[in-house]
A protein has these predicted regions:
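Membrane-embedded alpha-helical modules
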Residues: 102-221, 329-330, 334-443
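Intrinsically disordered, low-complexity non-transmembrane regions of multi-pass membrane transporters
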Residues: 1-26, 222-237, 273-276, 286, ...
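Membrane-interfacial loop-to-helix junctions in multi-pass transporters
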Residues: 175-178, 240-248, 278-286, 320-324, ...
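Short, non-helical or kinked segments that cap or interrupt transmembrane helices
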Residues: 58, 80-94, 136-145, 198-204, ...
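Juxtamembrane interface elements at the cytosolic ends of transmembrane helices
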Residues: 2-8, 38-42, 46, 182-193, ...
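Membrane-embedded helical hairpins/re-entrant loop segments and their flanking transmembrane helices
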Residues: 20, 46-84, 251-323, 446-452
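Hydrophobic, membrane-embedded alpha-helices of multi-pass small-molecule transporters
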Residues: 21-34, 38, 172-184, 202, ...
């Protein structure tokens, strides 16, 4: 379908066009930002399953392939799937705890994980039309709270990167902090003194400079790149036929529900940033793509997929809101899945370089949520309490991940997700305070939102 034929919002930023070179450069920014998260899930599961280094590399390539295809479908819109907004897709962290446990279970392993992923994806496609109707329960009060929580829940990732990453021999070493500060400072200077396209690719510029600097001082690790093949084709069912077991399937179905909750908040955030109203029809298309990607992923040796919150901040900070950018980024992910040496090169970007950029971008996500909260009646004490409690609930797994360690394992997709905790809290309290609180309060809040 042609972008120009889209009748929904003819003047929306999401259907702007850019020259090809600009598309590639801005799309590359999206890939560099999400790459670490995209390969983390297959890396963790591969290690838990006791795979060899070559098999883990194959898992990573499979994930990049599915992430690229899902990103293209989500952004472009094919058939009934795809929200047609600048969305990046990748393996979801919501299922990591459950999948690590499955990997160690006798008789389950990777084949059981892939079977559960396929079944959960099919389940998600069945419930997506019903889940899409919850958009009416996301007024600015709830949306702003959720988006603020998304930004805050991402911040530990940025800080971890800036300190050198989880595997750093000396986390927080002055050299890591200096590199992160240099990257962050360079972004600020570009936004202060430059205009136009230079601002659009500010993250790519400073990450390239940071990479070169780290290379000069010996901080770029290219070990394993020489042994990696130039070309590798991802084949379906590489690890054998998927197996279907009830307990893993039920666990992964719960994960899909949590993914839908998280994705709803992310889609609404993108709608605010790009100036598009996210309708139930659009939300259904987006959730169908999430579920369809997970269904497809199980056959191609990878895991449940969802929209990546990290990239929302990049859309806001650079001001490039056209979905053609993420379509190109999806194509780049597909290329990386076929070229292991190129994938090694991208993976060699030092964590401190990513951290400096991520501090600004993840902060922009939280700032977007705060801006949306201005549209709500935030002077009302009950609404203030809703925001306070929901953000607090969202920060629990961020501040102390082990806080809910003694609860049943099946609850971990909820209790380990700050986004899910904040969203469920905000929805519940809004229902209690404003919807069940009487038509007068609901009408009053609606009038306040329309005034803005």
């Amino acid at each position: 379908m042609s972008e120009l034929s889209e009748p929904r919002i003819p003047d929306a930023p999401a259907i702007q066009r850019l020259p090809l070179l600009q598309l590639i450069l801005v799309g590359l920014q999206h890939v560099l930002l999400m790459y670490g998260g995209a390969i983390a899930v297959p890396l963790i599961i591969g290690q838990a399953a006791g795979l060899s280094r070559e098999e883990i590399a194959f898992l990573i390539n499979a994930d990049l392939l599915v992430a690229g295809i899902a990103t293209v479908v989500q952004s472009l819109g094919i058939g009934p799937m795809g929200i047609r907004m600048p969305v990046m897709m990748g393996a979801s962290f919501a299922a990591v705890g459950s999948m690590v446990a499955m990997a160690g279970m006798p008789g389950i392993g990777l084949q059981g994980i892939f079977g559960a992923t396929i079944a959960a994806g099919f389940f998600g496609m069945l419930i997506a039309p019903f889940m899409s109707k919850v958009v009416r329960f996301f007024p600015p009060l709830v949306t702003g709270t959720v988006i603020t929580s998304i930004g805050l829940s991402l911040f530990p990732v940025a800080v971890n990167w800036a300190g050198g990453g989880s595997n750093a021999a000396q986390f927080g070493s002055p050299i890591y902090l200096a590199i992160a500060a240099l990257v962050l400072g360079s972004i600020l200077l570009i936004h202060r003194f430059m205009r136009g396209f230079w601002v659009n690719i500010s993250v790519l510029i400073v990450m390239s400079l940071g990479y070169v600097l780290c290379g000069l001082i010996g901080m770029v690790d290219l070990s394993g790149m020489a042994e990696a093949p130039w070309l590798q084709i991802v084949t379906p069912l590489h690890f054998g036929m998927p197996q279907f077991h009830l307990a893993p399937i039920l666990s992964m179905c719960l994960v899909v529900v949590i993914i839908f909750v998280e994705s709803t908040g992310m889609f609404l955030a993108l709608g605010k940033i790009t100036g598009q109203e996210v309708t139930p029809h659009m939300l259904r298309r987006g959730l169908l793509c999430d579920a369809g990607a997970s269904f497809f992923a199980g056959f191609f040796n990878t895991f449940t997929h969802s929209s990546f919150a990290q990239n929302i901040g990049l859309v806001q900070m650079t001001g490039v809101r056209c979905r053609s950018v993420t379509i190109v980024a999806g194509g780049l992910l597909i290329v990386l899945s076929l070229l292991p040496k190129a994938a090694f090169l991208v993976a060699s970007i030092p964590a401190a370089v990513l951290g400096g950029a991520a501090i600004a971008m993840f902060g922009m996500v939280a700032a977007t949520g705060i801006k949306i909260l201005q549209e709500a009646d935030i002077a009302d004490r009950r609404n203030q309490l809703l925001v306070a409690v929901s953000i607090g609930m969202g920060l629990i797994p961020v501040v102390r991940p082990e806080f809910f360690a003694h609860l049943p394992l099946w609850m971990s997709p909820i209790t380990h997700s700050g986004i899910a905790m904040a969203t469920l809290s905000a929805l519940t309290l809004n229902l209690l305070f404003n919807i069940l609180g009487g038509h007068e309060r609901a009408a009053e809040n609606a009038r306040h939102a329309h005034q803005h």
